Amino acid sequence: MANSLLTIDMITRKALEILENNLVITRTVNRQYDDSFAVEGAKIGSTLRIRLPDRALVTDGAALQVQDDNEQFTTLTVSSQKHIGVNFTSAELTMQLDDFAERVLKPRISQLASSIDADVANSYKSIFQSVGTPGTTPATSLVLLQAQQKLNESAAVMSPRYATVNPAANAGLVEGLKGLFNPVNTISRQFKNGLMGEGVLGLEEINMSQSIKQHTTGSRTGAHTVTTTVSTQGQATINITGTGSQTIAAGDVFTIASVFAVNPQTRESTGSLQQFVVTEANTASGGAYTSVKISPAIYTSANALATVDSFPQSSAVVTFLGSASTQYPQNLVYHKDAISFATADLLLPQGVDMASRQVHNGISLRVVRQSDINNARMPCRIDVL
């Protein structure tokens, strides 16, 4: 009886299935696929332009006040190409697909999934809202509810929202929340799996991931103040006093005295100081950090894109979150659309031994195998762009 050979399409579909099943953070974010590169192939540096929702001011009275469109766009850059190499022989192609997947694909694909998740987790550097106490592992419902509070004050859509935490936070939350008014099936999952599971405190899922990032804060120490009053709508830089050649790291979060966050729908103060995140590392020089790049951009309540109730004033105290030069885990609570993961088709090369590309649930994956005649090998690479 003749053996049937596994085809490259079968292998690619199975590899994509294994990849999806091993993703954690990436599975719960907005996944976009762009087929515009399907013919010529995408390259690192290619961009996708994403339109953000329009915002406008509500006016009172019978007189019409026409406003210009406040259309905003953000650019998503194809910034990395992930691949993993594997060798499989013609003899291994005679195996059953599940056996082949278990022996050849799963060990490598799981590492590819972890690397992709780590890239997505690195988006914390663009997130300006933070709750909890740096250095204290979450172990109560309060930190999850405070995270939900931040999302609500920012007018984020209620569902679907997710949390992805590191192993330490997962252990703390499962221990701290066990049996507290939880449905029987939730308690059962916690006991059997050691995971929080689904449908917890308004979150679709609370997942554990080993890809959650550790953030090392800048070396900034001592007191800091704003050096120059901000007066321009949409300004996304700020000047802060600094010492010597100390640093502020990308991902550092800070507040400014008397600058409060506003609800984007009502444009009224939430009563909480607006948090800002540094988007690019900055080194002090001449007693100041100059043009520190921040997010969100500063718009007052008079603007349709309002983020704060008033402009930061000169000499206002700046308070950084966490101690200087210290590592803190960056657990995430987010709405699905807060983070986008986009893939594009890689070019299918001609004249190789095997090549296939498959797309499923917003992920495009390519598998290529070629003969290495010099070393009598058949190297194969699995790529995601």
Where are these regions (language model features)?
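Short, flexible loop/turn elements at secondary-structure junctions
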Residues: D54, P167-A169, N282
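Long, contiguous amphipathic alpha-helices that act as assembly "spine/axial" helices in icosahedral shell
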Residues: I50, L76-V143, N152-A169, N193-M208, ...
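N-terminal "assembly arms/tails" that initiate or stabilize quaternary assembly
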Residues: M1-T74
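Exposed beta-sheet edge/beta-hairpin loop segments within beta-rich domains
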Residues: L97-D99, N239-G244, V367-N374
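A generic local secondary-structure boundary/capping motif
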Residues: F37-V39, Q148-S154, F191-E198, T227, ...
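Autoprocessing Asn-cyclization modules and mimics
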Residues: G172-S295
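Internal mixed-charge
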Residues: N193, Q210, Q274-Q275, T279-L385
